[in-house]
């Protein structure tokens, strides 16, 4: 997330340009076009950077670009790569880029809280390049926000990570890959721009926040704990010191960094003392 490639955001110039890219993408998809990961990322690459690579931290489309790189290097679609290399070996049978018809009765809606009417509403709009609300195979397989899963499946992935990339005696990720995913890589200057509340006291690895200063963070935790919050409130963290994995899921727009997830974590740690 130090590349300067950003998500759509109307609060700064590079984000506004990216908003134009995604808005055109939505329009074309609504007209029936199927725009691939490669095509969307090539369009995004023509947008200006928010800053020079490495200058600071800012959440963006890095994971989507990584998905395209995996396709190029493996010669497989991103979905097929993840399925064969991770999901099938881990037994993650409910994780995919869409929900098949036979499982739609288990699929939650995405909700938005209406402050004026004090109630939840189903989200009526697209976000982060996702469309169709996961009910059909997408042409754009988003590495940053494209997967549908369950708490059980997510826990299987987190368990593999906390055991150093090994699942049931079989190594799925190299030791170096696990280190890249679970070790802070930010410089002192970059860390200054990691200013989200849920990332206080943290650095950043490859797609995970990493706790470096427990006294500064919200709640409790040990140095080296890592994890992430999804946009809709999917939360996981691994504590390699106490060997704890926490999974918490809600389906609400802006649910990341939610108060309940931190309270749950605090209660669990207090119970283990």
Where do the PLM segments sit?
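Residue-level detector of beta-strand structural context in well-folded domains
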Residues: 206, 224, 234-236
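Generic C-terminus detector
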Residues: 251-273
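Short, small/polar residue-rich loop motifs at catalytic or cofactor-binding pockets
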Residues: 230-232
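Hydrophobic beta-strand positions
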Residues: 69, 237-238
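Short, surface-exposed loop or secondary-structure junction motifs
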Residues: 1-220
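Short, hydrophobic/aromatic-rich segments at coil-to-beta transitions
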Residues: 220-226
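Short, well-ordered beta-strand elements
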Residues: 236-237, 243-252
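Extracellular/periplasmic catalytic domains that process cell-envelope and extracellular macromolecules
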Residues: 200-201, 238-240
């Amino acid at each position: 997330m130090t590349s300067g490639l950003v998500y759509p955001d109307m609060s700064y110039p590079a984000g506004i340009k990216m908003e134009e890219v995604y808005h055109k993408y939505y329009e074309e998809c609504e007209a029936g076009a199927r725009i691939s990961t490669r095509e969307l990322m090539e369009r995004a690459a023509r947008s200006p950077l928010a800053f020079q690579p490495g200058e600071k931290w800012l959440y963006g489309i890095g994971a989507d670009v990584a998905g395209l790189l995996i396709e190029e290097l493996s010669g497989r679609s991103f979905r097929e790569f993840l399925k064969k290399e991770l999901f099938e070996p881990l037994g993650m049978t409910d994780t995919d880029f869409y929900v098949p018809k036979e499982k739609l009765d288990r699929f939650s809606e995405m909700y938005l809280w209406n402050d004026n009417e004090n109630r939840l509403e189903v989200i009526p709009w697209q976000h982060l390049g996702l469309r169709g609300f996961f009910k059909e195979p997408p042409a754009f397989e988003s590495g940053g926000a494209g997967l549908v899963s369950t708490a059980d499946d997510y826990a299987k992935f987190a368990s593999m990570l906390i055991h150093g990339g090994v699942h049931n005696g079989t190594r799925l990720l190299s030791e170096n890959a696990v280190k890249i995913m679970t070790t802070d890589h930010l410089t002192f200057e970059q860390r200054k721009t990691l200013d989200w509340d849920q990332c206080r006291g943290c650095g950043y690895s490859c797609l995970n926040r990493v706790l470096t200063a427990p006294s500064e963070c919200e709640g409790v935790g040990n140095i080296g704990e890592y994890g992430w919050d999804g946009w809709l409130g999917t939360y996981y963290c691994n504590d390699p010191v106490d060997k704890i994995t926490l999974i918490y899921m809600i389906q609400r727009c802006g649910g990341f960094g939610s108060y309940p997830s931190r309270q749950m974590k605090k209660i669990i740690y207090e119970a283990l003392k």
